[in-house]
Curated annotation (Swiss-Prot):
Annotated InterPro entries: Asn/Gln_tRNA_amidoTrase-B-like (IPR003789), YqeY/Aim41 (IPR019004), YqeY/Aim41_N (IPR042184)
GO molecular function terms listed in the Swiss-Prot or TrEMBL record: carbon-nitrogen ligase activity, with glutamine as amido-N-donor
Pfam families named in the record: YqeY (PF09424)
Record's subcellular location: Mitochondrion
Gene Ontology CC, one term: mitochondrion
Transit peptide residue numbers: 1-20
SUPFAM superfamilies found in the cross-reference section: GatB/YqeY motif
Keyword Mitochondrion among UniProt keywords: yes
Family in the record: Belongs to the AIM41 family.
This protein's name: Altered inheritance of mitochondria protein 41, mitochondrial
Predominant localisation class: mitochondrion
UniProt lineage: Eukaryota, Fungi, Dikarya, Ascomycota, Saccharomycotina
Species of the source: Saccharomyces cerevisiae (strain YJM789) (Baker's yeast)
Length: 185
């Protein structure tokens, strides 16, 4: 009897966390779960492993957020992190001459990229173009004065800019750091 009274409380809390998320986030997670079922039926081990690792990372992120809303931008950051982990692993495996593991990691990375491309988020090229325009505008505004990167970060409206550009703040920051050296030489 005690078990029955606890059970509904736990399931309601989990649905509340998902209810608090954006529709694109919920759609992406349900797509992953559906594709996991299809991969299990088709016995596609590589796809199954990649999707399970993605769902595991998503679940860990939801636990870390502690009830705060999650959106497609946090998913984009998570997928980017998973891809960079795969790239690091590939480099290590190449150094150790483990071609079998390189092929496995490359396959998983391709699967993650496929899901990353399906998110309603701006591509890296679009982000870089927007950042270049922003940095050019800030450079003309500053004139001949020496500009530091922390001043640029302070000028940006971090509440509205990510939603305008349809990307995560982390992706914007990475692009700013990457392009700052080229523009402010």
């Amino acid at each position: 009897m005690f078990r029955q009274s606890i059970r509904p409380l736990v399931s309601n809390r989990l649905t509340f966390i998902r209810y608090n998320s954006s529709p694109a986030y919920t759609a992406a997670v349900s797509l992953l779960k559906g594709d996991l079922k299809k991969a299990m039926i088709a016995k596609d081990e590589m796809k199954k492993t990649a999707i399970r690792s993605m769902l595991s990372a998503i679940k860990n992120k939801e636990i870390a957020l502690k009830g705060k809303s999650a959106d497609e931008y946090s998913l984009y950051d998570m997928y980017s992190k998973l891809i960079s982990q795969r790239k690091d692993s590939i480099n290590e495996f190449l150094a150790n001459k483990r071609d079998d593991l390189v092929a496995k990691e490359q396959g998983e990375m391709d699967i993650i990229k496929k899901y990353m491309d399906q998110l309603p988020v701006s591509s890296e090229l679009d982000i870089d173009q927007n950042v270049k325009k922003l940095l050019d505008a800030l450079k003309t505004k500053a004139g001949e004065k020496k500009v530091q990167i922390k001043e640029i970060m302070g000028e940006i409206d971090w509440k509205s800019l990510p939603t305008e550009w349809k990307t995560s703040p982390t992706a914007i920051k990475n692009s700013i750091v990457k392009q700052f050296k080229e523009i402010f030489k």
